[in-house]
From Swiss-Prot:
This is TGF-beta-activated kinase 1 and MAP3K7-binding protein 1. Interacts with XIAP and BIRC7. Interacts with TRAF6 and MAP3K7; during IL-1 signaling. Identified in the TRIKA2 complex composed of MAP3K7, TAB1 and TAB2. Interacts with TRAF6 and MAPK14; these interactions allow MAPK14 autophosphorylation. Interacts with STING1; interaction takes place following cGAMP activation and promotes TAB1 recruitment to the endoplasmic reticulum, triggering MAP3K7/TAK1 activation and STING1 phosphorylation. Its main location: cytoplasm. Gene3D superfamilies: PPM-type phosphatase domain. It comes from Mus musculus. It is found in: Cytoplasm, Cytosol; Endoplasmic reticulum membrane. The lineage of its organism: Eukaryota, Metazoa, Chordata, Craniata, Vertebrata.
């Protein structure tokens, strides 16, 4: 009967009520599922995707964003995404609320979600206890007679139903102020455009066994913080705060590492950061799951993932026409860097045999989008676009962005060099300053100052530094291929024969 009741409740949840909530079109999401690589470099999915996200706006101009990273199944992340929306978007927040009110509502919402999930598995836990009482005591499961096989199968199904947990990072925008609530290891970054470049700030702290504040909290409960830090994980996870995971919530006294705790050591209480004023800010907000920055750290080493991801987003803003495309391009790029590092067999390959699900949410605050998004820019009136292929060296790093330039031929009367008419040339000619920037990074704790420049080689600095040897004819192999340019020029001007590059 309990199983039938749960099945009915689950069927009633399809489709989700959140399907009718208005989406925020000032944000975009990209994602990739987990991968494990075999010796030949082929990747396969280790488990069904466990990440989730949300990006909604309410009628009272409140915006809600979230990225959720699950483990041991996706039930918890799905539950949290739906229930948290209900606890924050049904009138609980409004423009009359003070900063203290918003923080209180966020804390209350996480508490309700945690309690509601644990209550939702009560029936399964009761059924599990009932079935376990029917098994003979002291007999290992693999030695049980065949008549207990159905009970064992049902116990396995129940374990899958009640297992798992989730980490969450949530952002609320209300009254031009940003609030971030975090449980676990997902991250929130605020990237601001300044006169000195792109300022990258991590708004939350990772709740891990490396976090000294978390280790102190656990030590106050009577636990050995040094041993926890040495172990690095608690019941298979680095996080010290999580939603769900009934095993560590209900059974921590049976876990050697946690048994001495005076109260529940693994909690779902979020840390609230903010309010962060957004008036006059130009930039973007980043919410990302642990899998994204961990994959990049595996390939490039720890310490610079935030800055690298922010720089990738900055580059894609100039190339893409939608925020979804921006986020997906960055996720795809990190995924490619990770797989290429494994395939290279180099020093970092041993750190890249697999990666978890990756999710990236980007919320725009007036940052220029799509300045170089068109593969063939619109020419000035009377002009024509002639492509010029500029191949980068095959030896370049996969973390750099290759660029295809387009040469816009102006109409007569416009000057190519020096001054030009103010009619349309500025709009027609793409700006290249955002492509393949040189980043100057200065990091202190969670704050990073990132400056972009192209003065030390510009777009072509990835060209090999050594001189290319001349060929048999005494000429160096051309760097820029004008063949397509000459062909189109000849067609437009009625030439009988197609010119070729010298």
């Amino acid at each position: 009967m309990a199983a039938q009741r749960r099945s009915l409740l689950q069927s009633e949840q399809q489709p989700s009520w959140t399907d009718d909530l208005p989406l925020c079109h000032l944000s975009g999401v990209g994602s990739a599922s987990n991968r494990s690589y075999s010796a030949d470099g082929k990747g396969t999915e280790s488990h069904p995707p466990e990440d989730n996200w949300l990006k909604f706006r309410s009628e009272n101009n409140c915006f809600l964003y979230g990225v959720f990273n699950g483990y041991d199944g996706n039930r918890v992340t799905n539950f949290v995404a739906q229930r948290l929306s209900a606890e924050l978007l049904l009138g609980q927040l409004n423009t009359e609320h003070t900063e203290a009110d918003v923080r209180r509502v966020l804390l209350q919402a996480f508490d309700v979600v945690e309690r509601s999930f644990l209550e939702s598995i009560d029936d399964a836990l009761a059924e599990k206890a009932s079935l376990q009482s029917q098994l003979p005591e002291g007999v290992p499961q693999h030695q049980l007679p065949p008549q207990y096989q159905k009970i064992l199968e049902r116990l396995k199904a129940l374990e899958r139903e009640i297992s798992g947990g989730a980490m969450a990072v949530v952002a609320v925008l209300l009254n031009s102020k940003l609030y971030v609530a975090n449980v676990g290891t997902n991250r929130a970054l605020l990237c601001k455009s300044t006169v000195d470049g792109l300022q990258v700030t991590q708004l939350n702290m990772d709740h891990t066994t490396e976090n000294e504040d978390e280790l102190f909290r656990l030590s106050q409960l009577g636990l050995d913080a040094g041993k926890i830090k040495q172990m690095g994980v608690i019941c298979g996870q680095e996080s010290t705060r999580r939603i769900g995971d009934y095993k560590v919530k209900y059974g921590y006294t049976d876990i050697d590492l946690l048994s001495a705790a005076k109260s529940k050591p693994i909690i779902a209480e979020p840390e609230i950061h903010g309010a962060q004023p957004l008036d006059g800010v130009t930039g973007f907000l980043v919410l990302m799951s642990e899998g994204l920055y961990k994959a990049l750290e595996a390939a490039h080493g720890p310490g610079q993932a935030n800055q690298e991801i922010a720089a990738m987003i900055d580059t894609e803003f100039a190339k893409q026409t939608s925020l979804d495309a921006v986020a997906q391009a960055v996720v795809d790029r990190v995924k490619r860097i990770h797989s290429d590092t494994f395939a290279s067999g180099g020093e970092r390959a041993k750190f890249c045999p697999r990666h978890e699900d990756m999710t990236l949410l980007v919320r725009n605050f007036g940052y220029p989008l799509g300045e170089m998004s068109q593969p063939t820019p619109t020419p000035a009136p009377g002009g024509r676009v002639y492509p010029v292929s500029v191949p980068y060296s095959s030896a370049q790093s996969t973390s750099k962005t290759s660029v295809t330039l387009s040469l816009v031929m102006p109409s007569q009367g416009q000057m190519v060099n020096g001054s030009h008419s103010a009619s349309t040339l500025d709009e027609a000619t793409p700006t290249l300053t955002n492509q393949s920037p040189t980043l100057t990074l200065q990091s202190t704790n969670t704050h990073t100052q990132s400056s972009s420049s192209s003065s030390d080689g510009g777009l072509f600095r990835s060209r090999p530094a050594h001189s290319l040897p001349p060929g048999e004819d005494g000429r160096v192999e051309p760097y820029v291929d004008f063949a397509e340019f000459y062909r189109l020029w000849s067609v437009d001007h009625g030439e009988q024969s197609v010119m070729t590059a010298p």
